[in-house]
Amino acid sequence: MNDFPWLTIIVGLPIFAGTLIFFFPHRGNKIIRWYTICICILELLITAYVFCYHFQLDDPLIQLEQDYKWIHFFDFHWRLGIDGLSVGPILLTGFITTLATLAAWPVTRDSRLFHFLMLAMYSGQIGLFSSRDLLLFFIMWEFELIPVYLLLSMWGGKKRLYSATKFILYTAGGSIFLLMGVLGMGLYGSNEPTLNFETSANQPYPVALEILFYFGFLIGYAVKLPIIPLHTWLPDTHGEAHYSTCMLLAGILLKMGAYGLVRINMELLPHAHSIFSPWLIIVGAIQIIYAASTSLGQRNLKKRIAYSSVSHMGFIIIGICSITDTGLNGAILQMISHGFIGAALFFLAGTSYDRIRLVYLDEMGGIAIPMPKIFTMFSSFSMASLALPGMSGFAAELVVFFGLITSQKYLLMPKILITFVTAIGMILTPIYSLSMLRQMFYGYKQFKFKSLNSSFFDSGPRELFVSICIFLPVIGIGIYPDFVLSLSVDKVEAILSNYFYR
């Protein structure tokens, strides 16, 4: 291939460029914002260039591989590489982070630190999606927590310290199990630790040990993904965080759990995955209904959207555990699709909060007249969230359903039952989405507007630009899902060739 260290540059550029922010003058908010956005755009362009010119779509193996010895006595390598599974999340990360820095334009307090943390998050996420070493994977997983914690506890709402502490306790607690799984897999069967993904994939484990490893990894991912009952940090965190942080949380952070589930649990522990799958499918189906019905009872707008993302994650779990290539492709499509839709909904909730300073739905009403643009975009993304045909959510959920129904692993009756339960969840989704729209935008005005100038009150060009930038891929993927599916389809076949009952 080519020996140029593209991936190291892509992972390292944001955080190294971010450290330069601290040398900027203290008062130069505008310079800092423009600098951060330029770094994000440059990073996105480099990623797109590497993807277009140095990446073969039809090759299911690892590409652009880099392997540098890092710590000698522990056989710890800086080992990066991408394949069809990680390209989608990496491009999504670049896209959403660039738009989130643009969304964070109103942040003026400690703006140097804020923008540095955004860039540090960017590095951690791309490092996680492209790491090929178990310990490096874990380090990137942990590195992600520090910027999120600081962004939450410094730029959040009234109860920000409570929600930030809850977030760090949950995720750090899950990471302990993750670390035990990583070290157990690395140290098994030899005196030297083998942390390489390739050697771990070819390593046969006893089934009992494999189940133990699987369970450790699963708890770590169940906090991040979130899988019920480990999801309670998510509504609190989303309810308090600044909306640009919410975009990164909903758009990328939740996808890290799903990515880890496929990358480590499915690829490296196939026997245990086939044992755990039926139970996880049941949990996923319960999660879809539970989160959708809980969302209906939320007064807080952001918490309602947060529960809707928990509900959508249920489809990812079902797709991953159906163990068919259709289902797994559908899960990856749902990851990308929800990354766009969730980020957009939180962004629009935040911009409307900036305008009216209300967060409870029963205090709002009649906002559609003074804010027609925000109303239009909010309605469009709510429709995408409830899987309207022609939008990406519909394509993803349809492919997941097909994957579940065509699965060889399950008997017909359980498949019909699970499909029925998830269909009820899909009926509940429009109920909470449309009631949210009705409470916010329709009805009578219940509050006094701060400014009489109506043109200032509606969405400005910046907000409109961010919304349209997210809306175009949602429509594009909905009309032609092969944009995303063509990335992962060969890799998915390679993963599923390990499963013995196909």
From Swiss-Prot:
Its EC number is 7.1.1.-. The chain crosses the membrane at residues 4-24, 37-57, 87-107, 113-130, 134-154, 167-187, 208-228, 242-262, 272-292, 305-325, 330-350, 374-396, 416-436, 464-484. The keyword RNA-binding does not apply. InterPro entries: NADH_Q_OxRdtase_chain4, NADH_Q_OxRdtase_chainM/4, NADH_UbQ_OxRdtase, ND/Mrp_TM. GO terms for molecular function: NADH dehydrogenase (ubiquinone) activity; ubiquinone binding. Its main location: plastid. It is a multi-pass membrane protein. GO terms for cellular component: chloroplast thylakoid membrane. It catalyses: a plastoquinone + NADH + (n+1) H(+)(in) = a plastoquinol + NAD(+) + n H(+)(out); a plastoquinone + NADPH + (n+1) H(+)(in) = a plastoquinol + NADP(+) + n H(+)(out). GO terms for biological process: ATP synthesis coupled electron transport; electron transport coupled proton transport. Keywords: Chloroplast, Membrane, NAD, NADP, Plastid, Plastoquinone, Quinone, Thylakoid, Translocase, Transmembrane, Transmembrane helix. PANTHER family: NAD(P)H-QUINONE OXIDOREDUCTASE CHAIN 4, CHLOROPLASTIC (PTHR43507:SF21), NADH-UBIQUINONE OXIDOREDUCTASE CHAIN 4 (PTHR43507). Belongs to the complex I subunit 4 family. HAMAP family: NDH1_NuoM. This is NAD(P)H-quinone oxidoreductase chain 4, chloroplastic. It comes from Ranunculus macranthus. The gene is ndhD.
